[in-house]
């Protein structure tokens, strides 16, 4: 079974030990993405966010795995997360992660439509939710995100901005545009 891995952030420019075949391809499903998740090291990371995200094309790469559970495990290890934060679709068994990952139900629908004409029987992607409010006490907005970034110590702020700067050019979100306009990227 051919399995695709979807990416839109550091997975592309810093895949680390993620097993994959070939290079990242443009033409993945269009998903609403925004830098609305605060990571452990204070970066704002790009996540699927149906409330604040901008529809952007994602990328994909072939997994060397033939079993969807192995591809899920690979991505889970790379992302240093739990299994429920890895979404999947398996056309061979007609199963997906929508039931176990309610906030990604709509993403499953979008990815299923994209998968239709593709030469893959499965796909996996990171399904971390936005946590901006729980981490900062503020609802996510471009202004709140900039305020958050400006409140970081210098080295943490530079690391956070580097993450946004290194994202693929097509990940053109409102926050990224504003940071570019302010010449912070």
Locate the predicted segments by residue.
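A glycine-rich, hydrophobic/aromatic-adjacent loop/helix-cap motif
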Residues: 1-185
